[in-house]
């Protein structure tokens, strides 16, 4: 699975954000409201399990981590959905005014600008804190996808208000919090 690629679990489709590593083991991070749904994740609908949930945090946060159990060593890249990929070499927190791209399995790659950070978002299941808000278009199924700027990982896609005109917004969980929570790092 590449960053931004589709993942399936518990009858739902989400997206992976970034492939990460710890002690030689490979994982991907995604949205916590996705990993809350299922322990087992596949790369195709009804397909064989490629990874198993090792942690999930939602609400308050919106991140989770899945360990690859299929023996694969996936590239630490994000799918640009045009036949090419973006290498990810570091992670950082988004800043207001920053140009950002989102890769997810529904709306593919969309672009926008970071409009706010440290935002509290009230979902039906409870609030999540310290989120980033961007103008990138997104939709259901993009959840867990990658928010990035060049080779820098910025966020895990959490939710959106859709793609309507200039009012579109995509909310992300800052990825640095997930990386530190699980002791994992992005890799080339």
UniProtKB/Swiss-Prot annotation:
GO molecular function list: serine-type endopeptidase activity
Function description: Preferentially cleaves peptide bonds on the carboxyl-terminal side of glutamate.
Known EC number: 3.4.21.82
Active site: 33, 62, 143
Protein name from the UniProt record: Glutamyl endopeptidase 2
Keyword terms: Disulfide bond, Hydrolase, Protease, Serine protease
Subunit description: Monomer.
Record CDD domains: alphaLP-like (cd21112)
Disulfide bond entries: 14-34, 137-163
GO terms (BP aspect): proteolysis
Family stated for the protein in its record: Belongs to the peptidase S1 family.
Enzyme class: hydrolase
Substrates-to-products reaction catalysed: Preferential cleavage: -Glu-|-Xaa- >> -Asp-|-Xaa-. Preference for Pro or Leu at P2 and Phe at P3. Cleavage of -Glu-|-Asp- and -Glu-|-Pro- bonds is slow
Pfam families with a match to the protein in the record: Trypsin (PF00089)
InterPro entries: Pept_S1A_streptogrisin, Peptidase_S1_PA, Peptidase_S1_PA_chymotrypsin, Trypsin_dom, TRYPSIN_HIS, TRYPSIN_SER
Superkingdom per UniProt: Bacteria
């Amino acid at each position: 699975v590449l960053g931004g690629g589709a993942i399936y679990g518990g009858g739902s489709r989400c997206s992976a954000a970034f492939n990460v590593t710890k002690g030689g083991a490979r994982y991907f991070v995604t949205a916590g409201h996705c990993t809350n749904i299922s322990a087992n994740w596949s790369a195709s609908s009804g397909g064989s399990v490629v990874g198993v949930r090792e942690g999930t945090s939602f609400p308050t946060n919106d991140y989770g981590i899945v360990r690859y159990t299929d023996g694969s060593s996936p590239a630490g890249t994000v799918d640009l959905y045009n036949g090419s990929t973006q290498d990810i070499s570091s992670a950082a927190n988004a800043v207001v005014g920053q140009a950002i791209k989102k890769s997810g399995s529904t709306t593919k790659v969309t672009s926008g600008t970071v409009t706010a950070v440290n935002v509290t978002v009230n979902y039906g299941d409870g609030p999540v804190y310290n989120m980033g808000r961007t103008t990138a278009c997104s939709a259901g199924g993009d959840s867990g996808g990658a928010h990035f700027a060049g080779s820098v990982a910025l966020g895990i896609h959490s939710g959106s208000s859709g793609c309507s005109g200039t009012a579109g917004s995509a909310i992300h969980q800052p990825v640095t919090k997930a990386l530190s929570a699980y002791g994992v790092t992005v890799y080339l």
